[in-house]
Amino acid sequence: MAGHSKWANIKHRKERQDAKKGKIFTKWIRELTVAARQGGGDPGSNPRLRLALDKALGANMTRDTIDRAVARGVGASDGDDVEELGYEGYGPGGVAIMVETMTDNRNRTAAAVRHAFTKCGGNLGTDGSVAYLFDRKGQISFAAGVDEDSLIEAAMEADADDVVTNEDGSIDVFTSFSGFYAVRNALEAAGFKAADAEIVMLPTTSAVLDLETAEKVLKLIDMLEDLDDVQNVYSNAEIPDEVMEQLG
């Protein structure tokens, strides 16, 4: 699991940037709408909607905005359909990149994603070209200060895959994709309140980057993240701490 913390440093950098851009609201409005469309408007019986609801509230989205997004999903007409589409490719330095999107116009989204890859020295690939380098997992994160021993015991009892303590004292619990909601609920019932919980694509191998390549890869990730239809971007880039410090 050593690669997870390296992957996380890119993720946390992106989260700070997303918050500044205000894109996080758009992201969770779409997720609320799609989750409600697929599983109904009751978070009690729709785990995906419940997760999106928690995320939206955590981003300080108003209840009114949340309710409108859910209502739009439940009552959406065929003409309002939003598709979930994934794109795969390679960035500078041979870094594998996965892009998750939600779109009402697949041609527009495909063109925009392809343009980003091309402009930043990467190549958009075909389905399956890099997906085999990633595993879909659940990640449940806890802030520093949580009782580590008790959390590990509870996580193992809930059939979590692994528990990783990060340098800053925060703890990540990793689960299988299918077991994510069960583990999350079990930890919550045991009294552990997560700081974050989500389904992620974790790389099974990593590409260690120098400063020059890291700058190029992060430029591509930034450009992809800036696209309106993009929800998540994952890569197998591993940026050493000393390089990340130089990047700021």
Swiss-Prot record:
<keyword id="KW-0963">Cytoplasm</keyword>
<keyword id="KW-0804">Transcription</keyword>
<dbReference type="Pfam" id="PF20772">
    <property type="entry name" value="TACO1_YebC_N"/>
</dbReference>
<dbReference type="GO" id="GO:0006355">
    <property type="term" value="P:regulation of DNA-templated transcription"/>
</dbReference>
<dbReference type="GO" id="GO:0003677">
    <property type="term" value="F:DNA binding"/>
</dbReference>
<dbReference type="Pfam" id="PF01709">
    <property type="entry name" value="Transcrip_reg"/>
</dbReference>
<dbReference type="InterPro" id="IPR017856">
    <property type="entry name" value="Integrase-like_N"/>
</dbReference>
<dbReference type="InterPro" id="IPR002876">
    <property type="entry name" value="Transcrip_reg_TACO1-like"/>
</dbReference>
<keyword id="KW-0805">Transcription regulation</keyword>
<dbReference type="GO" id="GO:0005829">
    <property type="term" value="C:cytosol"/>
</dbReference>
<comment type="similarity">
    <text>Belongs to the TACO1 family.</text>
</comment>
<dbReference type="InterPro" id="IPR029072">
    <property type="entry name" value="YebC-like"/>
</dbReference>
<keyword id="KW-0238">DNA-binding</keyword>
<dbReference type="InterPro" id="IPR026564">
    <property type="entry name" value="Transcrip_reg_TACO1-like_dom3"/>
</dbReference>
<dbReference type="InterPro" id="IPR048300">
    <property type="entry name" value="TACO1_YebC-like_2nd/3rd_dom"/>
</dbReference>
<dbReference type="InterPro" id="IPR049083">
    <property type="entry name" value="TACO1_YebC_N"/>
</dbReference>
<protein>
    <recommendedName>
        <fullName>Probable transcriptional regulatory protein Psyr_1407</fullName>
    </recommendedName>
</protein>
